[in-house]
Amino acid sequence: PRAAEAFHQRYETPAGVDVMDGGTLGGWLLDEILSTRRMLVFDCCDFKEKPGTLKVLQKSDVKIWSSTKISPHQTGFNDLLASAAILGYELEDLAVVGIQPELLDDYGGSLSPLIRSRLDEAVELGAKFLEEWGVKLTPRPAGTKAAPLSFSVLELNEYEAGRPDAKEACRYGDERFLVRTAGHAVENPEETK
């Protein structure tokens, strides 16, 4: 979600072009795939490469029937594309701007300095694809801030400010999310302000 957030903060998109933080929504993203012609995805991907390696996968590079998951999420992106294909739908164009993370199992963890240092390049790679598809991007005016893609507490700076230090942080996820009882609804902190 950090690359999508950085992209959203840097560029305004025209009507009909949505920027969203898909996070780890898995199957919930199927409707998004089924309602779009072209899709640009930013994600960490296990390319089996050196950490920090940036790659762009285009439609023909993504093997939807592959059993190899390129994403650490429960329902992989390949699974979603396969589900769309079963329903008779195929994206016109697809580009995945992926980066090889240092750790794949640091759920809820911070971006490492190496990965953070590659965000600008990832954003520009994504912008290049959108422009090739005919999307006119407008840089946001200096000093303006885009509305959050999700709850503001999940934006990079606010999230990091609330994250426990390394001695207290659960390395298998962020305990702020793990302590919920199954079936317990997550309150929207924006509604309590």
Residues covered by each model-derived region:
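N-terminal catalytic or cofactor-binding beta/alpha core of small enzyme domains
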Residues: P1-E90, V96-I99, G109, P113-S117, ...
